[in-house]
Amino acid sequence: MHTHNNFKTPSDADELDDLDDDMVIGVIEEIAQEALVGEDVSDSDIDEHDLADVGAPEHNQNADENESISSDSSFDPNAEDSSDSDDSMLEEDEAEGASSGEATSAKRRKDDNDGPCGSAADSAAVDLDDLDDETDETVRAIIAAIKKPRSAPPEIKLEDFITDVCFHPDRDIIALATIIGDVHLYEYGNEGNKLLRTIEVHSKACRDVEFTEDGRYLLTASKDKCVMVTDLETEKLKKLYETAHDDAINKLHVLDENLFATGDDAGTVKLWDLRTKNPIFELKEVEDQITQMITNDQKKLLLATSADGYLTTFNIAARKLYVQSEPYEEELNCMGIYRGSSKLVVGTSKGKLYSYNWGYFGYHCDMYPGIKSPVSLMIPITDRIACVAGEDGNIRACHITPYRNLGVVGQHNMPIESLDINTSGELLASSSHNNDVRFWNVKYFEDFGDIKYNDKHNAYKEKRHNLPSSKCTNASDFFSDLTKEDEDNADNNDAAAGPSNSA
């Protein structure tokens, strides 16, 4: 502050450093406190500001005083300061400032109760414009971010690697499968998440976890070749399919409250009924890992993708192969059904998206370039919008037929391992190799309009555009805010100027 110029130079340089640091910290605390309370600048701050300006001499006066001091032969710069001079002056200033601050704070509270029409409120409003705009806006932005209500639950962090996530169909519960064979059940909410229970189900990695359609049972498939069915109410084991496969089970798909399918690392697919002990049927049409299985609402066909590049379709009622696609020179990792069950889209290890007409799964009808990085996960958000993710750690949204990149839904620091969406379609959950689960509110997709084939678009910008759920912001948003600010200021100036008088 300017008043420091009137103090003598202390003999120890550290004293001056400590004094400046304390005063800087005090000023920062005052600004933060004022912003948190949500009030204007207090009269005490205004008085201190005025005192500082009064205590600071004019340029010419300061020059004259410096000349008089330098001409004084009795001044010794190496002499020790008297302990009473600076300390007493500082204590008096602090005491006077404290008493003045208390009085003006009480007056300000009275003025606030009376309304903003008082002179103190007017002077505070005037001096608020004199503050540093950058500092003021920064503090307000921080406080606004803190007070802004959450739109999604906070992150869940585990010590063990998370292999799969699954939302409960009716309750705000999410199941997290881990590499040590346990399943953690969390109750999630915007205010916080609560661990309900941990179920020890497998001796090896639990690769897939699913709820039945009625939400009564929890099904898990593991590397130990077993399938476990757990009753959620009693937390007891309902059924154990020991050695359900000859190889490690990789995927599990629930068809309804009784039927489910499993696929293993060797390409075998089995269909099960909870009311029976043995599988309904078993087919092996590929030689590599089953990466995903899916059915539509009619549940007549069971589709399976595999790591050796095949899309295989089974007729459930006939219990036999329906059709198998031509082989692809890439892994088929994931798929989703869109356009009223008229389109099937498959994601590959080369980042491509193949589109099939429903029922014609021998060869794709369209190929989209995708994101140019391996697509290992896909979740339908709406009937025309999909979320895809993979090794780059980004969750991207894309429009199906016509294909368009819509932007980035969310990010992880490491490759993404699993994706799921809740029953309402508003909340997306993702887990990564960093042992974390993050939630993304994707309700805004309900307002997305349909994209036409002849719509103009910029593919480069769309691929890097951050959507509202993303933790990152777009550079263009900063300039758009500035433009909006300028427009608002121009409107205010026009309103203040009023109608012009014609000559």
Swiss-Prot record:
InterPro entries: WD40/YVTN_repeat-like_dom_sf, WD40_repeat_CS, WD40_repeat_dom_sf, WD40_rpt, WDR55_POC1. WD repeats lie at residues 157-196, 201-242, 244-282, 285-324, 327-366, 411-450. Residues 12-21, 40-50, 78-96 have a biased composition (Acidic residues). Belongs to the WD repeat WDR55 family. This is WD repeat-containing protein 55 homolog. Residues 1-21, 35-132, 483-503 are annotated as: Disordered. It comes from the Eukaryota. One of its GO terms (biological process) is defense response to Gram-negative bacterium. The lineage of its organism: Eukaryota, Metazoa, Ecdysozoa, Arthropoda, Hexapoda. Keywords: Repeat, WD repeat.
